Amino acid sequence: MATIILGSQWGDEGKGKLSDILCQKARVCARAAGGHNAGHSVVANGVSYDFHLLPSGLVNPQCTNLIGSGVVFNVQAFFKELAALEEKGLSHARKNLLVSDRAQVNLELHARVDGLEERELAGNKIGTTGRGIGPSYANKAARNGIRVHEIFDQESFEAKLRRLAEGYKKRFGDLLEYDVEEEIARFRDYREKLPDFVVDAVNYMQAAQASGVDILIEGANALMLDIDYGTYPFVTSSNTGLGGVITGLAVNPRRINVAKAYTTRVGEGIFKSEDVGEAGKKLQDIGREWGVSTGRKRRCGWLDLVVLKYSASVNYYTAWNLTKLDVLDTFPTLKVAVAYKDPETGKELEYFPADLGYLERCEVVYREFEGWQTPTTAVKKFEDLPRQAQMYVRFVEEFTGVPVKWIGTGPGRDDMIYL
């Protein structure tokens, strides 16, 4: 059985914690899309591990971890992250790690281009992480990108890299500060170190599914950052939902969605339930809302059920993991976005609009809930939660039509209620 963990909001929902719990039984843990722009922390046995490109199943010594074909793969980040995990005691990580030979290579060139493209946008910048994810996927779509298996054909690899660099140099001129020969030299070293990790991921996943082992797939980013279904253009450059998993790994999974009990977003783009006042600052402080990858503070606001329902309609979730319920413990009153209203007609929308200009003009309809103002961190059973917290969770289920199966009440692996 293959299980996917997907984010339903704008990322940072707390997917890593559920991944850590479920990967204890998994024998394969895989990433399907994205790159080292994603980031989450896993706390296990009192140690905090940071993951960006590598699957977090590496915490389990019995689990093989695969970076799939839909990922844009940065070799330097791969070895740096692996070394950091080994320094923290994961001595088994190296032998439990595989990379698809079909994955696209993310280059230093892409990162430099990413920065220049953001500069071109000036006041309309996307707010990328600057890791070159967009340019990598752009090269993939243009069919002039470099795949992992091509690293090992030195002549072909170097010729393709020089052509890419020349093309960008024509576009940006002296603004592009990049030495192609330095990058080529780095890959001569990688060419010696990388072969033991590279596999045909299609055959590997086919064999794993046929064997009947538990497979866990970690979704990166989240549905509202999806290139097709997110708040375009303020999105990432890959399919972050179910479609990206299917193409990135070729699996037939069940789908677990992870959502915070409130809402956050990093970078630019529309965020209808954002609170820029006292409540938003309080959520940011209590929830420790700053990014693992960039350190940027996350924008915070109330739970937006319009977003969650839309996300569920795209990804066909089978269950929710509602995270960070404990962050709401001290709020006397909670607000939940339940509809968007057309400012001219006053009618509530029955859909999440693609037109961001129109969405920006829409008003948010909130429902207020009484807060519980009591700690939930030590609670292990749903029936032991305060009545108001139970009502909050049940309303999420009722509104979205998807059952809540896990509730996060703290950062630790054991801070989870199972329903």
Swiss-Prot record:
Presence of the UniProt keyword Magnesium in the record: yes
Gene Ontology MF terms: adenylosuccinate synthase activity; AMP binding; GMP binding; GTP binding; magnesium ion binding
Pathway: Purine metabolism; AMP biosynthesis via de novo pathway; AMP from IMP: step 1/2
Protein name as catalogued: Adenylosuccinate synthetase
Cellular component terms per the entry's GO annotation: cytoplasm
Compartmental location: Cytoplasm
HAMAP family per UniProt: Adenylosucc_synth
GO biological process: 'de novo' AMP biosynthetic process; cellular response to cadmium ion; IMP metabolic process
CDD domains: AdSS
Cofactor descriptive note: Binds 1 Mg(2+) ion per subunit.
Family annotation (Pfam families): Adenylsucc_synt
Catalytic residues identified in the record: 12 (proton acceptor), 40 (proton donor)
Organism in which the protein naturally occurs: Chaetomium globosum (strain ATCC 6205 / CBS 148.51 / DSM 1962 / NBRC 6347 / NRRL 1970) (Soil fungus)
Role according to the record: Plays an important role in the de novo pathway and in the salvage pathway of purine nucleotide biosynthesis. Catalyzes the first committed step in the biosynthesis of AMP from IMP.
PROSITE patterns in alphabetical order: ADENYLOSUCCIN_SYN_1, ADENYLOSUCCIN_SYN_2
Matches recorded under SUPFAM superfamilies: P-loop containing nucleoside triphosphate hydrolases
Family to which this protein belongs: Belongs to the adenylosuccinate synthetase family.
Catalyzed reactions per annotation: IMP + L-aspartate + GTP = N(6)-(1,2-dicarboxyethyl)-AMP + GDP + phosphate + 2 H(+)
Binding site for substrate: 292-298
Positions that bind IMP: 12-15, 37-40, 129, 143, 221, 236, 296
EC number(s) on file: 6.3.4.4
Binding site for GTP: 11-17, 39-41, 298, 324-326, 408-410
Cofactor(s) for this UniProt protein: Mg(2+)
Assembly notes: Homodimer.
